[in-house]
């Protein structure tokens, strides 16, 4: 039995897995669907054929192509091969895994569920990659960092001399973090419960309610007692810290204006000890429906969901000045989450960024009306680009003299949240390199 047929310990043979990776990359390019959605769909469809190691291998291969995308394009141009998902994948096999032509020919044999046979021009071009490393001395800094051109200028502005190191961290394997639901359990109790079921975690270094998985394997989180009881949710430590910066208390009226599926809503409900009043609003009904399921499982009783027709919904005007805290977790380019979503680097361009900046400005203008005098607006994104963050806030404050910027460092100290994790004082910024979590930006505005 040859390499293309062998299953070894996997549910699928290597050649079949490679073909599946190629199909999924093509689907990404043709439909614009994100990596997670495509993986989830394929895994569900093939659940009887795939073992956990199959899934991990498929995801790692796709991630490798996406994380090395700009470098692979550079190489394909150098060896004069047209850039397609097929040639990108084959080039990555040689440069990342050190496969040789003979191995690729075995895997690409044109049989059922196998990639088509290598063409003469492909063989000629790919041979020029043998013995080469992924990084070449003639590559520019941005190509080595695999930074898309639409984000290059902004990230260089933010990262400065640390651009290459910060970009490398944005390509590292992400941590898997969880937030403990303190409405029903302590962090120690949840960690022990997970451990008894073979799910090993440790306390997160910055979030007082976070756990981090320390070794792969064990059951899926959804299969654990702690998850079924609503004691724990998946949430990156950085996202947890942004929720803490809101400073929600049980005596307050609080709104999560772009609540989505409710991750930060859940975190704030726990901080409020199920007291006060919490509104989770969004323009997307499907996301709010997912929030409903999560809120019920977590035992949250102080929150209501409200679907908005648009950013300037009439309800916002009617509710003007009613809230102590307004969290705007604004839609953004997601540059801070590239280590989780490497496909998003290549699915956006300058036009998309400009549209997001315009939408963020509109959301700021609308949602800030909800804050009462002395209340606070917390603006946050999972982007690291200045046009979505610092410059967005500077423009807002210039046009709105009824708000002032509070120093994030002072707010952090006021809330007694421990060591301040950001290198900025007025603004709050986290990066994978500096904090080992997703990249986030946040700031605190006070209504005068």
Identify the meaning behind each predicted range:
Residues 1-448:
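S-adenosylmethionine
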